[in-house]
Structures are given as C-alpha cells and as structure tokens.
C-alpha cells in the first residue's frame, strides 16, 4: 500500500492559505487587486475588528457570469493567463488563481456579482471551502465580496494574529499604497462602521497630505526620466522629512505595489551623506517597464520582483535620484503660526531620586554590586582630586558630602516628588538655538567640583569621557539617557501617580487612522506616564499636558514618534504593553548623538546613570559604558 497520498483540494487549499493569506491584510490586498483588474473606478473597503470578523470589498468593475462566479474559487483557475509564456506579457495584478480558493477554504465567503449586460446577478456562499449556495439575485453592476471570520476553522492560525491595532495598521498600509498607485480610482474606506477616508477625485497631493500631514506634498521633489526600455517618475522627500522607519517608502512597478532591496539600495546610496544614522528618506516612485524585463512570479505574495538587467536598472535609478537631490533646493517650506510661546517647565518636580523598582534583569544583585563599585571608583577619584586642588582656582565653597546617597538604591523608595528647586539651578541640554530641560537631578549636597570640571569631556558631541581611579570611562550619551528615562517611566507608571507638566497653550495633533487606534490601545499608560490627552475626533487629539522630560513645542513630534516606535516594537519584539510604552518613550525623548552638553550636564548624566539598576546596557541591550583600565592603556602604548 502506497504511503504517499494526494491531498484533497480542501486540505491543499488550507495549507496554501498559510502562504498566500498570512493575515487579514493579505486578503484585503487580493480583493483590491481583483477589483482593479476588473476595471473598477470606484472601490469601497469595509472591515470590522481589523478584518478578523469582516472584510468587504465592493467595486463597479466588469462583474462575473454565473459560471465564472463559481469557477473562480477553484484552485489555479484564472482569467489572466493561459500558458507560461503569458507571464512575459503580464499587465494584470493577479495571475496565479490561488488566492480566492485559499481564502474560501479558511473563511465564510459571500460573493455577489453582476455584469453590465445581465438582467440579474449571481450569489455564491462558501464556508470552509464548501459551496453552500449558488443562486440568482438582484445586485448592482460589479462585485461585492465579503469575507467573514477569517481562519475560523484554523485555530492555530487565528491565534497567531496580532492585536487589532497591529492588524489594522497592516490593512491601512495596504489600502494606502493602492490609493497612491491608482489616484484615478475613487476610494472609500470604513472601519467598524466609521468612515476613515473618502477620495473622490484624481488628486494625488490631497492623498499625500491626508496620509502624511498638511502641506506634505509641497515639500516633495517631483521628477520624470525615460529611456528606451523604462520610464521613472515620482517624488522624493527632502532631508528635513527623514524618518526613523521605512514606512514612507513606496515603489510601484507597472502599477504593482512592490518591494525591492536593489532599488531601495540605489535610492539610499543616492541620498548618501544627507542621511543621518538610522534615517530613511520618503520616496514615491513609479516605474513603467516592459513586462519581459521583470519576473513577478518569485514570491507567494507577489511583493518582490526580479530584473533581467539588475546593473542597468540600479544605475538608472541611482543616477536619476542623485541628480535630482544635487540640483534642487532642499530647504523645507515652513509656515509659522504666530502664537505665544508655550511656557517652559521649571523646577524638578519630575525627579524621583532613589527609585529602584525591581525590573526583570538576571543576576541583578551582582550587577548592582558591580555598578556600585564602579560608581565609588568614579566618585572617590573626584573627591580625592578635589581635596588636592590648589585653593583659589575655583571659588566654590567646600562642604562635606555623603557620596553613599548617590549610590543606586536597593529598596523601593517613595515616589513623592521632591521639593522644587530654583529655576536657575536646573542644568539644560542645548540643541542648536533650542534648549531642552535636562532630565537629570543636581542635588544640593553634590555641587560640581574642580576635579569634575577638569576631567569630563564630550567626544564628537556623542560620547562622554571621564577619568576614574582605575582608568577611563566612555559613555554613550544617547543610550545612557535612554536608560535613565526608561527606568523613570517604569517607576512613574507603576506608581499610579501621573506627573504631568500642563501646557498653557494645549496643542492639537492630527493622527493617521492606525496611529489613532494605537493611541486608544495605550492611552491609559500614556496618561500614567504624564501625557494629558483629550480626544476631539477620530483623527485629532488635544495634548494638554506632557511629561516633564518632553520640551514644550515637541509634544506632537514625540507623540507621533512614540506611536510609530510602539508599533514597530510590538511587531518585532513582542513586548509587554507597559514595557513597550516605556521603551518607546525613552527612545524618542532622550538626548541624541550629536547634541552638545555642558560639563554640568555631563556629570549630572553620569550621576543619574549610576543611580539606575542597570547602567551598563540600554533597554534594548546596547552597551552604555566602555571602561579602559590604566593597565590596558599601558599595554597599548608598550609600557611595561
């Protein structure tokens, strides 16, 4: 008896669905592409529960006959190609005939369709790959395709779906890309019975401004280039529009939403030194190329392509982009609103000295002992240097100090905010002409000493070098501050005592639809962190208060970046929600590499770093401190 058996179609389709339909957004993509291939110029998408309970696409395309309405659910049934040679002259988005069979096998499907010349339409109902009804029905011209309860019969697959906010973001990005590549189509998008957007005219600028912010399109550089076998057109972002993620990069090849490492590399290389560390440019590029020069049949989702002549394709894209960014004015267009400046926070009510909540670190006690020893090395060295300093060079009065009060605490301390300090006592971080309130406490019993001022340096406005008894410490200022803010955020949220700096002039922030969903998901933690937020409508939130670590005037930017960072961490790191919020906040609110600090700011940063429970690594695991001992330095210089 043979051990190898041919799988029934219904089983094969369920297995195939795991590759073709990875999440609700995959099903949305397939239905939208079918509507586009049908010649529709009006498409409506409606979802519920981020596509988990309902995905519905309605179009005014050519419709299907009764025979085709049932045949389209058969595996490898397609109207797009008839033999393999047709792939070299492909002008449609779909061609394999796999998607509908896969979708129908893992959901409950209802299809209503009618051709223009037919008197009545066709109704098809399928559940788990089995036909339940095929009948004639009254329906408008075009097609209405509904998918309910995706993966209802594949529990193992359904449990791996992400939160509604995450799945919604993927759907939003899918339909967003289609609206940009097909501006001539009228698009409507509804989520849980609320209209998200409605684009009823052929205006690409309107869509760009909706998705990315007011007047966004005015800061783009338009270009068009053409040669014998390819045409390039599109828009490039100015350096002032750089992002920390790649979610504002769009590449459309023959009107197909595509990802290409080759072309992305060509564009990034063309920007060259205009890009900072971990910065990505906006681009929206349309490539029209003869189908036989590309292969779109290389990935289950058809998101990747291969080129027949990669070198020439790369060189042309790189050359076009580089030429445009070298010859045009890249200064951003800025519109200034005349309104009173927001007040600057004063005092230190946001500091919580001595707080050391139990965080999930391995061997924490050993790390704390090591941290204490290194901190004692740093402090005792400066105390000894100060005692040996010649009198008269620094006129600061000397007082007896208790260095132990600066060591990391091992017990949970009170979260009562400390007494307000005089405003002039607050050190500040300088960022060009702007000043940010420092987040680091300067205790009255620990003034800067002569030794401290002499032995703290900033290297390339990125690293802090400080001399200790046993050698040299090198500290990354960004991740050091990130560690401080992370532990402070965790402590504040766990204390249930929000510490908010109220704004004299509240600021309204416009959110994208997915940002608004993320905001609703984490709003409680944001309030605990110190944000005072009032929702005005489904796209607008009023920021009335901010954590004291956020400079007034940057609240909207920080909020946008936090929501983006939170979503990125949620997808890639699978963090617990409160931990994710704290890490996103710390990452986006901390001082950056390249920011100049004063000596007082640097010594204060070091003091607070050593007051954390884990001063050696940032919340993401990057090293904060590198120590070079005298012995290691001696070896480098060949000293015996």
Curated annotation (Swiss-Prot):
A single BP term in Gene Ontology: mismatch repair
InterPro entries associated with the record: DNA_mismatch_repair_CS, DNA_mismatch_repair_MutL, DNA_mismatch_S5_2-like, HATPase_C_sf, MutL/Mlh/PMS, MutL/Mlh/Pms-like, MutL_C, MutL_C_dimsub
Span list, region Disordered: 332-353, 408-431
Any Pfam family the entry gives: MutL_C
Molecular functions per Gene Ontology: ATP binding; ATP hydrolysis activity; ATP-dependent DNA damage sensor activity; mismatched DNA binding
GO cellular component, one term: mismatch repair complex
Sorted UniProt keywords: DNA damage, DNA repair
Family in the record: Belongs to the DNA mismatch repair MutL/HexB family.
PANTHER family reported in the protein's UniProt record: DNA MISMATCH REPAIR PROTEIN MLH, PMS, MUTL (PTHR10073), DNA MISMATCH REPAIR PROTEIN MLH1 (PTHR10073:SF12)
Function: This protein is involved in the repair of mismatches in DNA. It is required for dam-dependent methyl-directed DNA mismatch repair. May act as a 'molecular matchmaker', a protein that promotes the formation of a stable complex between two or more DNA-binding proteins in an ATP-dependent manner without itself being part of a final effector complex.
Protein name: DNA mismatch repair protein MutL
Organism the protein comes from: Chloroherpeton thalassium (strain ATCC 35110 / GB-78)
Organism lineage: Bacteria, Pseudomonadati, Chlorobiota, Chlorobiia, Chlorobiales
